């Protein structure tokens, strides 16, 4: 399935993100909604750890257009609700996290788990189911190591399935390393990247920019399809009654 409009590839540091992908755990083609780095200020120097690409299913565009078409990139960037709609919308998402610096699975998964649990407890939605899902999540990563250029990939199903896969190169296809069934965990992974307290402001801003442009093009195409008949209709004489 082709994306709704033309999208371009992106490069973050030395890592390229293709315009479309067919990820593990999905039968669909997803388009690149945005990409950016994650980093931290360490001793006065900004250090980049990972490059992140966020992909969405084609049906995301009409879904998001209902509420967000006509908004500027800055308006979308500033809207917590917009990113919640991206995270929770009824369409597939795929996130590729490529390491710029070496990272162990334990380091990565424990930080993600910590953020998820803190968020759930803060909003009162943490249950035993989430606790078990987190344990499975930690187990998947426990013995993994990720040298520079390796990728951690998440396919998020609207049904609540989180497919996790790993690659030592830029491949995004192949078999899944694990599938965890928990809707809150599935959504929390992407939320931790582009949500209110997301770890990648760069990816968040880029998603807003690219999606705003896609919605603008989608709206323009819709207007071109329906505009002409509407114009012709307006020329029909009105007969008084």
Curated annotation (Swiss-Prot):
Keywords: Flavonoid biosynthesis, Isomerase. The lineage of its organism: Eukaryota, Viridiplantae, Streptophyta, Embryophyta, Tracheophyta. The keyword Manganese does not apply. Part of the biosynthetic pathway for all classes of flavonoids, a large class of secondary plant metabolites, many of which are brightly colored. The keyword Isomerase applies. Its EC number is 5.5.1.6. GO terms for molecular function: chalcone isomerase activity. It holds the Pfam family Chalcone. Substrate binds at residues 50, 115, 192. It is an enzyme of class 5 (isomerase). One of its GO terms (biological process) is flavonoid biosynthetic process. This is Chalcone--flavanone isomerase C. Belongs to the chalcone isomerase family. Catalyzes the intramolecular cyclization of bicyclic chalcones into tricyclic (S)-flavanones. Responsible for the isomerization of 4,2',4',6'-tetrahydroxychalcone (also termed chalcone) into naringenin. Pathway: Secondary metabolite biosynthesis; flavonoid biosynthesis. It catalyses: a chalcone = a flavanone. The record marks 108 as: Important for catalytic activity.
